[in-house]
C-alpha cells in the first residue's frame, strides 16, 4: 500500500512538472480571460529575455479578432500545414502562426515555452545554427513588430496528437 501511495505521488508530481496536470479542454479555452492573460504574460515574459535584447520589442496584447482567426485554424484540425495566407490576413496584415500538438492536454505556458526553447538552435543575425533544426516557432514568439495576438485550442479526436493549440501573431 505504501508503494502504491508513493507511486501515485510521484506520478502526480511528474505529470505536473511536464505540463500535464489534470486538465481538460475547458481548462484551456481562450474565451476565459485568465487563460488569455496566461498566454499574453508568458509571451511578454519570454520576449523580455531575448538575447541580445531587442531595442524596440513591442508588448503583446490580446485581440479577439485574431483569436477568432486562430480558432478557425484550430477547427481545421490540419496539423500538417499552416493556414493559407488568405485565412490569416487580418486588416491587410499577414499574421504569423504557431501550432502545438500533443496527445494529452498541456498548459498554454508549456506549449509557448516549447516554441521559445527553439532559441537554443537560433543565433541572432545568422539564423538556425545548423541545417534541419526548427526555429520558426521561436521567431514568431519574439518577432519585434508583432504586438497583437490571439490563440485557440481544439480537440481533434481523429489525430494521434489530438490537442491542437494555435496562436496567430500580427
UniProtKB/Swiss-Prot annotation:
- Asked if the record carries the keyword Secreted, the reply is yes
Q: How is this chain modified after translation? A: Contains 8 disulfide bonds.
Q: In which tissues is it expressed?
A: Expressed by the venom gland.
Task: Check the UniProt entry and state the signal peptide residues, or none.
Answer: 1-22
Which GO CC terms are listed, alphabetically?
A: extracellular region
Q: Which UniProt keywords apply?
A: Calcium channel impairing toxin, Disulfide bond, Ion channel impairing toxin, Neurotoxin, Potassium channel impairing toxin, Secreted, Signal, Toxin
Q: Where is the SCP domain?
A: 41-169
The terms under GO molecular function for this entry are: calcium channel regulator activity; potassium channel regulator activity; toxin activity
Q: Which superkingdom?
A: Eukaryota
Tell me the compartments it is located in: Secreted
Q: Which residues are connected by disulfide bridges in this protein?
A: 77-156, 95-170, 151-167
Describe its function.
Blocks ryanodine receptors, and potassium channels.
Q: Which family does it belong to?
A: Belongs to the CRISP family.
Q: Give the protein name, as stated in the record.
A: Cysteine-rich venom protein VAR4
- Which source organism? Varanus acanthurus
Amino acid at each position: 500500500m505504501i508503494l502504491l501511495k508513493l507511486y501515485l505521488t510521484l506520478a502526480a508530481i511528474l505529470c505536473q512538472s511536464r505540463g500535464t496536470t489534470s486538465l481538460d479542454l475547458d481548462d484551456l479555452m481562450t474565451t476565459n480571460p485568465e487563460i488569455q492573460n496566461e498566454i499574453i504574460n508568458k509571451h511578454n515574459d519570454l520576449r523580455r529575455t531575448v538575447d541580445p535584447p531587442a531595442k524596440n520589442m513591442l508588448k503583446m496584447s490580446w485581440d479577439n479578432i485574431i483569436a477568432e482567426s486562430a480558432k478557425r485554424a484550430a477547427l481545421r484540425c490540419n496539423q500538417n500545414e499552416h493556414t493559407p495566407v488568405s485565412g490569416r490576413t487580418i486588416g491587410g496584415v499577414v499574421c504569423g502562426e504557431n501550432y502545438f500538438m500533443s496527445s494529452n492536454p498541456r498548459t498554454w505556458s508549456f506549449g509557448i515555452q516549447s516554441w521559445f526553447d527553439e532559441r537554443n538552435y537560433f543565433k541572432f543575425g545568422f539564423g538556425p545554427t545548423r541545417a534541419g533544426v526548427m526555429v520558426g516557432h521561436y521567431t514568431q514568439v519574439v518577432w519585434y513588430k508583432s504586438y497583437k495576438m490571439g490563440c485557440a485550442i481544439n480537440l481533434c479526436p481523429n489525430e494521434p496528437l489530438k490537442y491542437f493549440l494555435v496562436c496567430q501573431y500580427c
